[in-house]
């Protein structure tokens, strides 16, 4: 990121700004690294970092900020927002690794675990269509169930983001077309207010208490298109209820654009912002630790804090951290959070998030089984290898337009080398096409073979969870079992 981007003293018209669309900001990759590592550690064993699931909220804020920043930058530079170009860029960025994951998980089950192939069908279709969050809400199937085989259910957060990527550019296209550039700060106020409203609605809809069947605890359910679904499922997985972080990031993009941070007063405040950013990152670490009570259920108000302001606290801390690391000449952003290791992890955070959960599941078979340190290290080596291979040979080449160039060379060979290249590409294309087809056909014909525990959970047997209330905590009878059936605690 340049230390001295240009800023006009007056407010220029749309389409008059020169320069790069959005400069590269290593500090943001550093924040991504912190977020994805917290999630991975939590997934390995919640006892290690019980609030690590909140790293997903950090991702939401970063995504809201960057996507809105890209849209505003395009409007400032060209005078318009080309939606088709935006969506093509997002598809190049997200789809290759996702399709690789879906094919790989399906192929693993075809070869080594056919009995579970049928159980993947719904998750695979939902993941492919980016509706995993609503699929889990609708079916009541979350991967927090300690006994679930769910190698694809972590895709719910990507579904939330992709739905945002579809809707938000249209919203911004309309707003930026109708409003003047000078009204961007007002939009920031509106978006912040909407984020607070979403947090307020989440707090209002949340009900503490015991969760059982609908007949036993009807207050813990809500009606969605005629179907009774858990409130905690809806609030944790729902696109609207999880939009507060995305909105906070969007609000920040209205007033905190890297190319507009050249004023001398802002430069002199570098030390102050570094201090605030350090405090914000420390606050995130504190939430990652203190929210372990949400998983353990050791305090009376743990769940209340999560749904009654917890997500908003994480969102605000994330906003402050983003402000600090994106500020020109930020020591925190360039050298601390933006150190080479964190940048390397951050640039591959998408692949790390995609592959780590599937690798963990392939080893332990069930979601709730904690990993030992030795298992964790071994599985992370595999995850890092898969992530790097995916990044170097699938994700990055597609983003850089390699497929388009290969297609042009294949369609119009002009030398013997091009002809040989055409043959190699043809063979590779057949393999790439056949693998997902084989997986899809096998999955379509597979029978669902749930184990006894899954069948019991589907019948709402032995599927009660205690959510602490403001008053005394409910207690269980001697020998009674409690299972986390909702998704309130897992990203």
Name the predicted role of every residue range.
Residues 433-490:
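Membrane-interface segments at or immediately adjacent to transmembrane helices
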Residues 1-7, 491:
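N-terminal acidic, proline/glycine-rich, low-complexity intrinsically disordered segments
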Residues 5-7, 12-18, 23-28, 34-450:
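Hydrophobic membrane-embedded alpha-helices
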């Amino acid at each position: 990121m340049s230390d001295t981007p240009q800023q006009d003293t007056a407010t220029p018209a749309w389409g008059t700004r020169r320069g790069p669309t959005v400069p590269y900001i290593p500090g943001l990759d550093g924040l991504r690294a912190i977020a994805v590592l917290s999630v991975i550690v939590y997934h390995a064993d919640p006892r290690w970092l019980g609030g690590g699931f909140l790293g997903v909220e950090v991702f939401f804020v970063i995504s809201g900020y960057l996507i809105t920043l890209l849209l505003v930058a395009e409007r400032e530079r060209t005078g318009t927002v080309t939606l088709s170009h935006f969506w093509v860029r997002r598809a190049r960025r997200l789809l290759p690794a996702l399709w690789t994951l879906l094919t790989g998980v399906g192929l693993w089950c075809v070869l080594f675990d056919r009995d579970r192939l049928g159980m993947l069908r719904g998750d695979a279709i939902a993941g492919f269509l980016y509706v995993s969050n609503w699929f889990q809400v609708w079916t009541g199937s979350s991967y927090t169930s300690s006994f679930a085989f769910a190698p694809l259910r972590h895709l719910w957060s990507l579904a939330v983001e992709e739905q945002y990527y579809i809707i938000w550019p249209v919203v911004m296209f309309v707003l930026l077309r109708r409003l003047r550039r000078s009204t961007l700060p007002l939009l920031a106020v509106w978006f912040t207010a909407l984020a607070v409203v979403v947090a307020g609605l989440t707090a209002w809809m949340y009900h503490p208490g015991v969760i059982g069947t609908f007949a036993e605890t009807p207050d813990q359910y809500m009606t969605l298109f005629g179907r009774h679904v858990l409130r905690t499922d809806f609030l944790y997985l729902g696109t609207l209820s999880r939009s507060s972080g995305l909105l906070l990031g969007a609000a920040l993009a209205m007033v905190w654009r890297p190319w507009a941070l050249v004023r001398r007063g802002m430069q002199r405040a570098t030390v102050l912002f570094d201090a605030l950013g350090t405090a914000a990152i420390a606050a995130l670490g504190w939430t990652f630790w203190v929210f372990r009570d949400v998983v353990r259920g050791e305090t009376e108000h743990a769940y209340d804090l999560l749904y009654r302001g917890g997500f908003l606290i994480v969102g605000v801390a994330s906003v402050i951290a983003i402000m600090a690391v994106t500020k020109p000449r930020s020591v925190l952003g360039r050298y601390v959070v933006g150190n080479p290791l964190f940048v390397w992890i951050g640039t591959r955070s998408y692949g790390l998030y995609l592959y780590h959960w599937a690798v963990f599941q392939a080893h332990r078979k069930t979601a709730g089984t904690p990993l030992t340190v030795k298992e964790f290290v071994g599985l992370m080596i595999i995850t890092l290898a898969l992530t790097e291979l995916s990044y170097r040979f699938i994700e990055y080449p597609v983003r850089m337009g390699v497929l388009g160039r290969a297609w042009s060379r294949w369609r119009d060979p002009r030398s013997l080398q091009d002809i040989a290249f055409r043959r190699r590409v043809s063979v590779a294309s057949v393999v790439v096409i056949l693998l997902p087809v084989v997986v899809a056909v096998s999955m379509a014909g597979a029978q669902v073979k749930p184990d006894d525990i899954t069948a019991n959970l589907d019948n709402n047997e032995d599927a009660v969870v205690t959510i602490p209330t403001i008053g005394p905590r409910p207690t269980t009878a001697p020998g009674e079992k409690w299972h986390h059936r909702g998704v309130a605690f897992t990203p």
